[in-house]
Each structure stands twice: as structure tokens, then as C-alpha cells.
Amino acid sequence: MSCTIEKALADAKALVERLRDHDDAAESLIEQTTALNKRVEAMKQYQEEIQELNEVARHRPRSTLVMGIQQENRQIRELQQENKELRTSLEEHQSALELIMSKYREQMFRLLMASKKDDPGIIMKLKEQHSKIDMVHRNKSEGFFLDASRHILEAPQHGLERRHLEANQNELQAHVDQITEMAAVMRKAIEIDEQQGCKEQERIFQLEQENKGLREILQITRESFLNLRKDDASESTSLSALVTNSDLSLRKS
């Protein structure tokens, strides 16, 4: 049972990370779609202004205006096609999110059902509750199991079935507590990962700044060395010229 819980915890953590990536991608696609819509509206407005200018400035060649309008129309069609592709990609991401959450709920349901395989009545009730939460947010998964247990215990039962459900109440509550604890551990792990990521980003930024400073120092040192070499070369040239002139003077003397 502990191995199953650990495996479910690892899978749930992976699913949460994948959901976060899909959420970020979906938000990015929404922003891009909004920007493209604004660009399309701006293009349409620009085309209308061009038409108005064409009516006002009739002395200008119509061929130039027609070519400009045709070019703008091509750009608008390209933007519309790109907008359509982005919308399709956004729908695919949303479908993937729904599929991932459905798989996650099924896995958590199988975990609870495995511990209740000897009680078909509880399984049927859990199945009914599972079918009612297809559109519930992922952060409400532990609330689903609490609602399921509450619904089972509050349902009208009689005789042996009622007593049997009351006898299994403590065991079901224990599993609900385990699932709630798993959710808390998942949230804690995500927070730790985010904190670690922030620390790594800060460390990378610090190293980049240090690297930039060292590069600047190296550049200054290199320039100073080159200038020093140039000065030495000029001094050597001047000294050679002076020696040559002195030698010539001595020879003439």
C-alpha cells in the first residue's frame, strides 16, 4: 500500500508539473491570440484609412495605392491564418489538460477503490461521485473524496447495509486523510521546487554579472597592454632614428 501511495504521489507530482507547463503555454497562446487580433483590427483600420486617402488624393497614381492595398490584404490574410493556427493549438492544449486531469482522477479513484474491493456498495457510490466531478478543478481533488464519503454515509440505508457502511466509516476516513496528506506533500514539494528554481535563477544572474565584470576588466587590461606595446614600439622607433642620425653625423665629421 505504501508503494502504491508513493507511486501515486510521484505520478501526481509529474502531472501537476505538466499541468503548470500546459497552463503557461495556454496563457502564452491566449496573449499571442489577443495581440494578433489587435494587429488584425489595426490592419483593417489602416486599410480603411488608405481607402479614404485614395478618395481624397485622386491626383496620385492609383496603381501605387492598389499595390499597397493588395500588400496589406496579404498581410491580413497571413495574420488571420496565424490566428487560426494559434486558436487550434490552444484548443489542443485545453484538451490535453482535460485528459491529464481525467487520468489523475482515475488514478486516485483506483487507489481508493483498491482498498474497498470487498465492498461493492461503496464502489458503486464512489463511481457515482466520480462521474459528478469531471469539471472540478484539480485543487479540489481531496474535497471530492470528502464529499464522496459524506454522501455515502448520509445516503438512506437500511439494515445490514447501513451498519456495514457505518463500520467502514473509520477506514474510509483514514484513506481520505492519507489522500489529503498526499495533496499537502505535493503542494509542499511544488513550493520547494519553486524556491529552488528561484535560488538557481538568482545564482545564475549573479554569475552572469560577475562574468560580465571580469570580461570588462579583461578588456581594459588587454587595451592597456596593447597601448603599452604601441608606446614601446614608438619609443624604440624614435630611439633607432636618433641613433641613426647620430651615426650619420659622426661619419660626416
Curated annotation (Swiss-Prot):
Stretches with biased composition (Polar residues): 235-253
Site positions (Breakpoint for translocation to form FGFR1OP2-FGFR1): 132-133
- Molecular function in Gene Ontology: identical protein binding
Q: Which UniProt keywords apply?
A: Chromosomal rearrangement, Coiled coil, Cytoplasm, Phosphoprotein
Q: Assign the protein's first listed, main location to one coarse class.
A: cytoplasm
A GO CC annotation recorded here is:
cytosol
For this entry, list what GO says about its biological process.
response to wounding; wound healing
* Alphabetized InterPro entries for the sequence: SIKE
Asked if the keyword Cytoplasm belongs to this entry, the reply reads: yes
User: What positions belong to coiled-coil segments?
Assistant: 5-104, 160-223
Q: Which disease is it linked to?
A: A chromosomal aberration involving FGFR1OP2 may be a cause of stem cell myeloproliferative disorder (MPD). Insertion ins(12;8)(p11;p11p22) with FGFR1. MPD is characterized by myeloid hyperplasia, eosinophilia and T-cell or B-cell lymphoblastic lymphoma. In general it progresses to acute myeloid leukemia. The fusion protein FGFR1OP2-FGFR1 may exhibit constitutive kinase activity and be responsible for the transforming activity.
Instruction: Report the function annotation for this chain.
Output: May be involved in wound healing pathway.
Q: Which family does it belong to?
A: Belongs to the SIKE family.
The name this protein carries in UniProt is FGFR1 oncogene partner 2
